[in-house]
Curated annotation (Swiss-Prot):
Its cofactor is a divalent metal cation. It comes from Caenorhabditis elegans. It comes from the Eukaryota. Keywords: Cytoplasm, Developmental protein, Differentiation, Hydrolase, Metal-binding, Metalloprotease, Nucleus, Oogenesis, Protease, Signalosome, Zinc. This is COP9 signalosome complex subunit 5. Component of the CSN complex, probably composed of csn-1, csn-2, csn-3, csn-4, csn-5, csn-6 and csn-7. Within the complex it probably interacts directly with csn-1. Interacts with glh-1 and glh-3. Interacts with lag-1. Interacts with kgb-1. Belongs to the peptidase M67A family. CSN5 subfamily. PROSITE patterns: MPN. The gene is csn-5.
Amino acid sequence: MEVDNVKPSSSVPQRNWEKENNVQNVDSIFEYNNKQQVEIRNAKPWDKDPHYFKQIKISAIALLKMTMHAKRGGNLEIMGLLQGRIDANSFIILDVFALPVEGTETRVNAQAQAYEYMTVYSEMCDTEGRKEKVVGWYHSHPGYGCWLSGIDVSTQTLNQKFQEPWVAIVIDPLRTMSAGKVDIGAFRTYPEGYRPPDDVPSEYQSIPLAKIEDFGVHCKRYYSLDVSFFKSQLDAHILTSLWNSYWISTLSSSPLFSNVEFLNNQIQDINQKLSAVDKKLQLNDRSVDGHEALMKVVTDAKAVGDELETGRISHLVKQLLFARQAGGGCGCSHASAGSPMDIAVATEPEKAGPSPSAPEPAVEMADA
């Protein structure tokens, strides 16, 4: 059942976040059966069926920890490990912990320090009586979606070979901030030499033009798992404590300002894709591929427009709220030097100002 019976201590934003991400309230999922886990690991059913694992269930605490970690990383990739267990055809993720790694905008490198930290942390968990095993890893793709790159595929394949069962999670913190819902995906790679059957086309996701080639080359070497989220009444206090630090940063920031570079990159990417589609249609205006590519660009543009409008509304609401609080809380026009509506209207000329001439060089790059 979905989270409807929430404790009074939960704030309204926290309840909205849980419902937006469809967090379910389940207590029995936390029960650990050691005998069952040993039997499953000894049987190794995933060796016989490359598509054995079909879904992953993530606790709300683990989800919030990963989201906060990825958000702190900003434009740099981050990495951490997943703790949990397996149950039939599912991974159950109960907790996560971050790794001290060296990240760039396109990759993350785990050095000796990270491996040492990983070993010590796991040993401390065993000492404290925590029975959950490390069953996978997570990392971020800032601004370019949830999928596995060539390096990710190699890393996941290696881990599945020597540390099964193992799963990979990818989070996009920039798209999460823009959309308001956690952008997340979970993946497993196929064994070497295995050719997957032609499946039904998956749901379209926007991939930057610079990443499309990497995405296309490796997209048949892995598959995605259905992702769901859960929580229990026992971890409500921990979730509330985490949320108290999460909502402050969310409330004090705006995607219109914190995601300026990401939004500009999205607009430039759409411009480049339109230039490529225009060339394709000029050669053959009845090209099916050209029209399909055009519809995908339209989908991307609509998504960017929706994110901008959502960010604008959120920003105006915060201005109205805090201008009223600063004026003494009565909400009257005389309460402050400028009424909330005056402040909101004052921001419009800034938004209507001349936009940067970023599309021009993007067209030249596409023509080149």
